[in-house]
């Protein structure tokens, strides 16, 4: 690595809206404010909702399904 061209790493705090505070190393140099983190994200907490796209797929196939068939 070339000396003198790389940014300095500093320990900063990343604060989530749920109140979780995470200490990370970053080149940003100032505290971060997060919307979601691993403690409150629906995927990690198990509260994720499955979107039912079956209606959209059926509607698409109904409109364009016959175009590919000969």
Swiss-Prot record:
GO terms for biological process: translation. Gene3D superfamilies: Ribosomal protein L31 (4.10.830.30). GO terms for cellular component: ribonucleoprotein complex; ribosome. Pfam families: Ribosomal_L31 (PF01197). Coiled coil: none annotated. It comes from the Bacteria. SUPFAM superfamilies: L28p-like. Keywords: Metal-binding, Ribonucleoprotein, Ribosomal protein, RNA-binding, rRNA-binding, Zinc. Binds 1 zinc ion per subunit. Zn(2+) binds at residues 16, 18, 37, 40. Its cofactor is Zn(2+). GO terms for molecular function: metal ion binding; rRNA binding; structural constituent of ribosome. NCBIfam families: L31, PRK00019.1, PRK00528.1. Binds the 23S rRNA. Belongs to the bacterial ribosomal protein bL31 family. Type A subfamily. This is Large ribosomal subunit protein bL31.
